[in-house]
UniProtKB/Swiss-Prot annotation:
InterPro entries (alphabetical): SAICAR_synt/ADE2_N (IPR028923), SAICAR_synt_PurC (IPR033934), SAICAR_synth (IPR001636), SAICAR_synthetase (IPR050089), SAICAR_synthetase_CS (IPR018236)
Record EC number: 6.3.2.6
A GO biological process held by the record: 'de novo' IMP biosynthetic process
Name of this chain's protein: Phosphoribosylaminoimidazole-succinocarboxamide synthase
Top EC class for this record: ligase
Gene name tied to this protein: purC
Keyword hit for Flavoprotein: no
Gene3D superfamilies noted in UniProt: ATP-grasp fold, B domain, Phosphorylase Kinase, domain 1
Superkingdom field: Archaea
Catalytic activity: 5-amino-1-(5-phospho-D-ribosyl)imidazole-4-carboxylate + L-aspartate + ATP = (2S)-2-[5-amino-1-(5-phospho-beta-D-ribosyl)imidazole-4-carboxamido]succinate + ADP + phosphate + 2 H(+)
PROSITE patterns named in the record: SAICAR_SYNTHETASE_2
Pathway listed: Purine metabolism; IMP biosynthesis via de novo pathway; 5-amino-1-(5-phospho-D-ribosyl)imidazole-4-carboxamide from 5-amino-1-(5-phospho-D-ribosyl)imidazole-4-carboxylate: step 1/2
UniProt entry keywords in alphabetical sequence: ATP-binding, Ligase, Nucleotide-binding, Purine biosynthesis
GO molecular function (one): ATP binding
Length: 238
């Protein structure tokens, strides 16, 4: 099914398939942080992220959220719809962590009374700056109607995912979402995994995500395996 490489990003490689409307997303073991300044590899990272994303996409689909997910080709390769990516990264924040604590007078660990939605312009060249509705519309990134729909979807996904993770022993301080257009609809794209979410253990507060690599806080491969064992235990039974 896989034909030629279309694009290689920081942690995934995208391939064309024999179907012009479908792509294969290969989750790699590559690690990057701080806009690619810090790089490494982590054993089985791609596999765990692919399996976690698969589980979450399937769960969200059952809840009525449309995604680009079509199925798995292999343990770390996902078949997805070819979408026109909207150049907005949506970050729902439930607990203060990361950049928000450096940019605003809020202490890490502060639980927000309601989710805070942050929109960033998806651009390595410009450093993914924060944008608002007006800028997105003026730049032609999305219409106001699309932005309203994305905001509504992001809040719904946040509520579903937050509840799901808490039932599996994780807090969800924040995470990143990307959306794309396909067949006249907006669908959830990219991935939802340890690379794109902050997962904190409910009991210990331990980070179980890419912050372990960013700030040299522990063994990332072991942490990703722990997350996978809770969310997709079936892959360890094979």
């Amino acid at each position: 099914m896989k034909t030629e490489e279309l694009y290689s990003g920081k942690a995934k490689t995208i391939y064309k398939t024999e179907n012009p409307n479908e792509l294969i997303s290969e989750f790699r073991d590559s690690l990057t942080a701080f806009d690619g300044k810090k790089k490494s590899e982590a054993t089985n990272k791609g596999y765990y992220n692919a399996q976690i994303s698969k589980k979450i996409f399937e769960m969200l689909e059952e809840e009525g959220i449309k995604t680009h997910y079509l199925g798995m080709v292999s343990g770390n390769e996902m078949l997805v719809k070819k979408v026109d990516i909207i150049l907005i990264e949506v970050i729902p924040r439930n607990i203060a962590a990361g950049s928000i604590t450096r940019k605003y007078p809020v202490e890490e660990g502060t639980v927000f009374k309601e989710p805070v939605l942050v929109f960033d312009y998806k651009s390595d060249e410009f450093g993914d700056p924060m944008i608002n509705d007006d800028i997105a519309v003026v730049m032609g990134i999305a219409t106001r109607e699309e932005i309203d729909f994305i905001r509504s979807m992001a809040l719904k996904i946040n509520a579903i995912l937050k509840s799901y993770l808490e039932s599996n022993g994780f807090l969800l301080p924040d995470f990143k979402l990307e959306f794309g257009r396909v067949d006249g609809e907006i669908v959830l794209a990219d991935e939802i995994s340890c690379d794109t979410c902050r997962f904190w253990d409910v009991e210990t507060g331990e980070s179980m995500d890419k912050d372990l690599f960013r700030f040299d806080k522990g063994d990332l491969s072991k942490a990703y395996e722990k997350v996978a064992r809770r969310l997709v235990p079936e892959i360890f039974e094979e």
